[in-house]
Amino acid sequence: MMCLSRYEKATFGAGCFWGVEDAFRKVDGVVSTRVGYMGGHLENPTYEDVCTGLTGHAEVVEVTFDPDVVGYSDLLDVFWSIHDPTTLNRQGPDVGEQYRSVIFYHSDEQRRAAIESRRRLEESGRFRDRIVTAIEPAGTFYEAEEYHQQYLEKNPRRRCYLMRLLSTR
């Protein structure tokens, strides 16, 4: 039985949520993941709504993790490694505000850690272009339709842009 009180949440948008979720599910200490939508103005959006680009929502992954096993800073490292944080509203062939690079923080501690990790990455020189990743307070999480949950596990022959990025690192 899980003791939920000791677990924490982290929410990330880094392009198509299928691949982002798949990457985080492989991290030791991640207890569960859910894909969904956050950061927009429409209540209870559907995938079709979000794909119009008119809702303001990002495709996100809500990560529930055990901080005794994996730290938030470790999750930030995964986040930075699985997408290009210098492309505005785009990851590979996926274009639109819903594919933006964004960290939704759940506490002041997460906000500070996210800002510091972005600063360190900017100073590292790893990316030639400016990092455009937004860091915003977490709002309402709207869970995506069931067929999107653990999509790449259910459909192992499918791939997305993120997976190609991971395979080259």
UniProtKB/Swiss-Prot annotation:
Enzyme Commission code: 1.8.4.11
Signal peptide: none
Protein role: Has an important function as a repair enzyme for proteins that have been inactivated by oxidation. Catalyzes the reversible oxidation-reduction of methionine sulfoxide in proteins to methionine.
One Pfam family linked to the record: PMSR
Protein name: Peptide methionine sulfoxide reductase MsrA
UniProt-listed SUPFAM superfamilies: Peptide methionine sulfoxide reductase
GO biological process: protein modification process
Coiled-coil annotated residue ranges, if any: none
InterPro entries, A to Z: Met_Sox_Rdtase_MsrA_dom, Met_Sox_Rdtase_MsrA_sf
Catalytic activity of the protein: L-methionyl-[protein] + [thioredoxin]-disulfide + H2O = L-methionyl-(S)-S-oxide-[protein] + [thioredoxin]-dithiol; [thioredoxin]-disulfide + L-methionine + H2O = L-methionine (S)-S-oxide + [thioredoxin]-dithiol
Xref: Gene3D superfamilies: Peptide methionine sulphoxide reductase MsrA
Catalytic center residues: 16
Alphabetized UniProt keyword annotations: Oxidoreductase
GO molecular-function terms, A-Z: L-methionine:thioredoxin-disulfide S-oxidoreductase activity; peptide-methionine (S)-S-oxide reductase activity
HAMAP family membership: MsrA
Family: Belongs to the MsrA Met sulfoxide reductase family.
Organism: Methanothermobacter thermautotrophicus (strain ATCC 29096 / DSM 1053 / JCM 10044 / NBRC 100330 / Delta H) (Methanobacterium thermoautotrophicum)
